[in-house]
Each structure stands twice: as structure tokens, then as C-alpha cells.
Amino acid sequence: MIRAKQGFIMQKMLNDYMIIATGENADTFRSIIQTNETGAFYWHMIEKGTTFGNLVSAAMERYEDLDEATARQDITEFLESISPAVETIQ
């Protein structure tokens, strides 16, 4: 299961989405992670707790012309870009 770490929130600023550390996390993670609407779509699933497979399925459903290999690659890259804000639970 992939989920957002406690203390990370998403805020929309103009046309961009920012993942921001709050509370104690703000003391150790002083950056802002910028993403787009697709990233926000994934983030909302991650906030609730999801699996990699569910992210892939949701992406392919949302973007009908997206093939599985590309979805897997894109989601892997997205998860790497937001790695400070997520955790994997077995």
C-alpha cells in the first residue's frame, strides 16, 4: 500500500498543485513539490491509501489512450518525484 505521510498536504496555487510539508515535517523537509493536474489526481488516491496497481488502472481508465507500460513508467517517475511525501506499507 502506498499512502501519504502524515503532515504532507496538497494545495492548489493558480494552475499548479503543491505538496507541502506541515508540522514537524516542515522542520526537516523545507521544499515544495510542484505537480500538475494528473499528479493531483494520483495524490488524492495516495492520500486515501492505494496500490501501485490501482494507480495504473485509474490512469488507464482516465486516459483511454494510455497503455499499461507507459502508465507504469509515468507513475513510477511520479512516485519518485514525491518520495519524501509518501510511504509504502507492506
Task: Give residue spans per PLM region.
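Acidic, low-complexity/disordered tracts enriched in E/D and polar residues
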Residues: 1-44, 89-90
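Long, charge-rich, low-complexity alpha-helical segments
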Residues: 31-90
